[in-house]
Amino acid sequence: MIDAEGFRANVGIVICNGHGQVFWARRINQQSWQFPQGGIHEGETPEQAMYRELYEEVGLKPEQVEILYTSRQWLRYRLPKRLIRREQRPMCVGQKQKWFLLRLKCREEDVDVLHSGHPEFDGWRWVSYWYPVRQVVSFKRDVYRRVMKEFATQAMPFRASGGRQHRRKR
């Protein structure tokens, strides 16, 4: 679904573990890494799209994760001019995304990025919470920064300010 301004409705997924780390996936046959994301189909809610994309791209079912938080706003990024398909109608100039923060409830071994017939990723790993903001492709960086800032207290309740705060005994 592409809106009147040319932005495709999309969901983004941040999966965290109990150690303040997030799921980071490598795009198939590329050296670029990102969070799982994907388009919202006609008649689908953002949550339904998130669960569909989660299964298609990561091989996880709803009962294997817990939704901790959903972004308050739709966040947008523009595609670089070289990536815009000008012959496509309607023309897509970028993505508008609703983001979901999930906690993994199952074993890591249950993650299977290669399970679908058309995988988006060929590898994954856990990375430190803020790592993706520095490593994602530049045109997504602002959205990642905003998402991670918004999700920080939910993803790492004791680490949002950089670590646990200890009071000195007087």
Curated annotation (Swiss-Prot):
Chain span(s) of sequence motif Nudix box: 38-59
Sequence ranges assigned to domain Nudix hydrolase in this UniProt record: 6-149
UniProt GO MF annotations: mRNA 5'-diphosphatase activity
GO process terms (BP): mRNA catabolic process
A GO CC term attached to the entry: cytoplasm
Keyword Hydrolase attributed: yes
Cofactor(s) needed: a divalent metal cation
UniProt EC number: 3.6.1.-
Cystine residue pairs: none
Keywords per UniProt: Hydrolase
Keyword field contains Hydrolase: yes
InterPro entries registered for this protein in UniProt: Nudix_hydrolase (IPR020476), NUDIX_hydrolase-like_dom_sf (IPR015797), NUDIX_hydrolase_CS (IPR020084), NUDIX_hydrolase_dom (IPR000086), RppH (IPR022927)
Similarity comment text for this entry: Belongs to the Nudix hydrolase family. RppH subfamily.
Function noted in UniProt: Accelerates the degradation of transcripts by removing pyrophosphate from the 5'-end of triphosphorylated RNA, leading to a more labile monophosphorylated state that can stimulate subsequent ribonuclease cleavage.
Protein name stated in the entry: RNA pyrophosphohydrolase
Lineage, opening ranks: Bacteria, Pseudomonadati, Pseudomonadota, Gammaproteobacteria, Alteromonadales
Gene designation: rppH
